[in-house]
Regions:
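Low-complexity, acidic Ser/Thr/Pro/Gly-rich terminal tails and inter-domain linkers that flank the onset
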Residues: 35-64, 82, 140-161
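Terminal connector regions
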Residues: 102-103, 108-151, 207-235
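Short, hydrophobic/aromatic beta-strand segments
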Residues: 71-76, 174-181
Length: 235
């Protein structure tokens, strides 16, 4: 994913799956269940993807296009505080050539961040020409040093044509949100960041039920557990 010669942009992914039921660094366990790593790998290995790198008060917003065609791209960059207030916003329109990556925006946000480095994060919303969208977020300090708030997460579970839809939203910045239910399933997304008050929709398809009961909205509603990074903090 580097900016250099195309032949130097390979990545080694270790390791995909397990062939015995033990605790390991595989991203898919022995039973076919996706761990947090695999959900994240699905995003960072996407054919069209965005990235944020921060150092000090500086941020570099990048985009990679591994398809065989040039792709036009719209990126909205925001600096938000943990209460989701927008402190800075700028939209950039650009084109990412086939099989290449670019820096969309590089900026020192010291004037925006001030003394709030532990309470702010960078957000980039990517919209590609085919309508594909993704959102990236990155803090300016290690997450363990962030003054995260305890999010109040609201959910709504419905069923349509055999597909379970989970609507989820939070009232503050919620990094690394993790969904879990009683049955073994593969969610359409998991281990994601909630960076705004907009609702995110997660799907469970019939073919993604690995074991357990026949899924229904009622089953999911009763057993759904949601955690975020803040829940790992000592009280």
């Amino acid at each position: 994913r580097g900016l250099g010669d195309v032949y130097k942009r390979q990545a080694l992914y270790w390791q995909l799956n397990d062939n015995w039921p033990v605790a390991s660094w595989a991203s898919i366990d022995y039973f076919g269940r996706w761990k947090a790593l695999h959900y994240m790998a699905a995003r960072f290995f996407a054919p069209k993807a965005g990235y944020i790198y921060t150092e000090g008060t500086k941020a570099v917003i990048s985009a990679a296009n591994e398809t065989l065609e040039n792709q036009s791209l719209n990126v909205t960059v925001r600096i938000r505080d943990v209460e989701l207030n927008v402190l800075f916003e700028e939209t950039v329109e650009t084109t990412v050539k086939a099989q290449s990556s670019i820096h969309v925006l590089e900026r020192d946000f010291a004037d925006v961040i001030g003394s709030k480095k532990r309470r702010v994060f960078a957000e980039a919303v990517y919209t590609w020409q085919d309508g594909t969208t993704s959102t990236e977020a990155e803090s300016f300090v290690p997450y363990k040093h962030m003054d995260l708030l305890q999010p109040q997460i609201e959910t709504s579970v419905t069923e349509k044509d055999g597909t379970i839809e989970i609507q989820i939203s939070a009232d503050c910045f919620a990094p690394f949100v993790w969904l879990e239910i009683e049955e073994d399933v593969i969610f359409s997304d998991n281990c994601f960041d909630l960076t705004s008050e907009e609702t995110k929709t997660i799907y469970i398809q019939k073919e993604d039920v690995l074991s357990g009961k026949v899924l229904s909205a009622d089953n999911v509603r009763k057993t759904l557990k949601i955690r975020s990074l803040r829940d790992t903090y000592e009280q």
